From Swiss-Prot:
Gene3D superfamilies: 3.40.1350.10
Transmembrane segments: none
Alphabetical list of InterPro entries matching this protein: Restrct_endonuc-II-like, tRNA_endonuc-like_dom_sf, UPF0102_YraN-like
Disulfide bonds: none
Pfam family, one: UPF0102
Gene Ontology molecular-function annotations: nucleic acid binding
Native organism: Alcanivorax borkumensis (strain ATCC 700651 / DSM 11573 / NCIMB 13689 / SK2)
SUPFAM superfamilies attached to this UniProt entry: Restriction endonuclease-like (SSF52980)
Protein name, entry field: UPF0102 protein ABO_0585
Family, as annotated: Belongs to the UPF0102 family.
PANTHER family, alphabetized: UPF0102 PROTEIN YRAN
Superkingdom of source: Bacteria
Length: 125
């Protein structure tokens, strides 16, 4: 898969790469790009019985703290609210434990993609 080029398609391409990489790690996709008024969740996956709400972040370089530093408290709150909305719409998942992951993606010096997967990146209070 060529490295991300078009600014317009960067987010979509990053999410496709992330989905492929995470399924390679043994997770299965439940939903992509869940949208609601409260926010958006890039990927919702199952890790065995755990429902995983995943934020995907792509950065060209780390000059602004990298991909993971961009998930601030405001973004975390929006993800938590969107996850609550998802669970309200999908009662079949109510029994599952949930977690919030962040998958950072950045090019290395040879333009290959480096993945940094933070499981349980933050918690809902």
């Amino acid at each position: 898969m060529p490295l991300l080029r078009s600014k317009k398609n960067t987010g979509r391409d990053a999410e496709k790469r992330a989905a492929k990489w995470l399924t390679g790690q043994g997770l299965s996709i439940v939903e992509r790009n869940f949208h609601c008024r409260q926010g958006e969740i890039d990927l919702i996956l199952l890790d065995q019985e755990t429902l995983v709400f995943t934020e995907v972040r792509w950065r060209k370089h780390q000059s602004y703290g990298g991909a993971l530093a961009s998930v601030d408290q405001h973004k975390q709150r929006r993800l938590i609210n969107a996850a609550q909305h998802f669970l309200a719409r999908h009662p079949e998942h109510h029994h599952r434990p949930c977690r919030f992951d962040v998958l950072g993606m950045e090019p290395d010096s040879q333009q290959a993609v480096l993945y940094q997967w933070i499981q349980n990146a933050f918690y809902s209070e």
